[in-house]
Amino acid sequence: MPIRARIIGIDPGLRFTGFGIIEADGNRLRHVADGVIATDGAAAVAERLHTLDAALARLLATYAPDHAAVEETYVNRNATATLKLGYARGVALLAPARAGIAVAEYGAKTVKRAVVGTGAAEKDQVALMVRRLLPGAAITRADAADALAVAICHAHHLATASRVPAA
């Protein structure tokens, strides 16, 4: 059975969180919205997380997605930066779950493989393929392109799961 779903993809970050909303109808994908949620870098971490949570709640209420997909956190050498990214990711996971929306998680290589065909793709290759898969989308920020890629990855996984018979 072909899938029909509205999906929000989220690329979490404490300073900038990208979001992308698509509709999947069978093999066709349609761009709905995308953008970036920015927090004040001078504000306390708790205030920034509150800003992120409130913005995600508004997006979820406005666009009413059926599914959410969040990119997994990569660990870098700066432990403090990794922890802060983890805080933002926690909010990105909690907001849709609190709204009763199923949340999937995908690593960067899985997203790249689903969108470009290789897990070693560069960011500009991912953005180019997102634009090809979503014609007419005027994507202006890399974070938004990444979030749309996460949503596309989830759409592909939903489509595959719908074709595989249950055991």
From Swiss-Prot:
Keyword presence, Nucleus: no
Keywords, alphabetical: Cytoplasm, DNA damage, DNA recombination, DNA repair, DNA-binding, Endonuclease, Hydrolase, Magnesium, Metal-binding, Nuclease
Domain of life, per lineage: Bacteria
Binding-site positions, Mg(2+) 2: E71
Protein's cellular compartments: Cytoplasm
Pfam family, one: RuvC
Residues at the catalytic site: D11, E71, D143
Cofactor binding note of this UniProt entry: Binds 2 Mg(2+) ion per subunit.
Any one Gene Ontology cellular component term annotated for this protein: cytoplasm
Metal-binding is among the record's keywords: yes
Transmembrane regions listed in the UniProt entry: none
Cofactors demanded by this protein: Mg(2+)
Binding site for Mg(2+) 1: D11, D143
MF terms in GO: crossover junction DNA endonuclease activity; DNA binding; magnesium ion binding
Matches recorded under Gene3D superfamilies: Ribonuclease H-like superfamily/Ribonuclease H
The protein's Enzyme Commission number: 3.1.21.10
GO biological process: DNA recombination; DNA repair
Catalytic activity reported: Endonucleolytic cleavage at a junction such as a reciprocal single-stranded crossover between two homologous DNA duplexes (Holliday junction)
Family affiliation: Belongs to the RuvC family.
NCBIfam families (alphabetical): ruvC (TIGR00228)
Role according to the record: The RuvA-RuvB-RuvC complex processes Holliday junction (HJ) DNA during genetic recombination and DNA repair. Endonuclease that resolves HJ intermediates. Cleaves cruciform DNA by making single-stranded nicks across the HJ at symmetrical positions within the homologous arms, yielding a 5'-phosphate and a 3'-hydroxyl group; requires a central core of homology in the junction. The consensus cleavage sequence is 5'-(A/T)TT(C/G)-3'. Cleavage occurs on the 3'-side of the TT dinucleotide at the point of strand exchange.
Oligomeric form and interacting partners: Homodimer which binds Holliday junction (HJ) DNA. The HJ becomes 2-fold symmetrical on binding to RuvC with unstacked arms; it has a different conformation from HJ DNA in complex with RuvA. In the full resolvosome a probable DNA-RuvA(4)-RuvB(12)-RuvC(2) complex forms which resolves the HJ.
The protein's name in its UniProt record: Crossover junction endodeoxyribonuclease RuvC
Organism this protein belongs to: Acidiphilium cryptum (strain JF-5)
Upper taxonomic lineage: Bacteria, Pseudomonadati, Pseudomonadota, Alphaproteobacteria, Acetobacterales
